[in-house]
Amino acid sequence: ALAKHPLFLEGAFEVQDEGSQLPGYLLEPKRGEMVVDFCAGAGGKTLLLGALMKNTGRLYAFDVSDKRLANLKPRLARSGLSNVHPARIEHERDTKIKRLAGKVDRVLVDAPCSGLGTLRRNPDLKWRQSEDSVAELTVKQAAILDAAAKLVRPGGRVVYATCSLLTAENDAIVAAFLAKHPDFSLVPASAILAKQGI
């Protein structure tokens, strides 16, 4: 198994599917920048961001769950990255977030979602989601995206992603955000990825 391969144990690679990698490449973090992974979870995308930053700059890995951040610790140790700073937050208005207002170059929001884009791997999800639960999630997603936008300096970048296929959790969230924040503009993912040869 890959998890027992010497190169994996040395931190030379992580296992991650394409859909999980793309948000990191869309964020395009650079060496020496200040970057926030707003909903870091167990840190798969965090590790990619840290590697793309060439282990320089400062990368904050925020999450509301101690358990998920605890799962990041061994992965972070294995990776050898020293630019990652995991921190538990209470919510998107936490003082740890507010103190970074206007100082951050790039923010990744991999928002909590219904997960309905992962039905192939998690077929039981379709029975656990309802219109009400999705509506509740969209309120949370919009609040997180608004909070993330306050962090970026002028000219910075925010990438919003979910693993849902629902318009309500994606296009509608982004459209409402752009209507509320005319100082932000939509950049086609294809243009960013093409520039990187992806």
Role assignments for model-derived ranges:
Residues 1-198:
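S-adenosylmethionine
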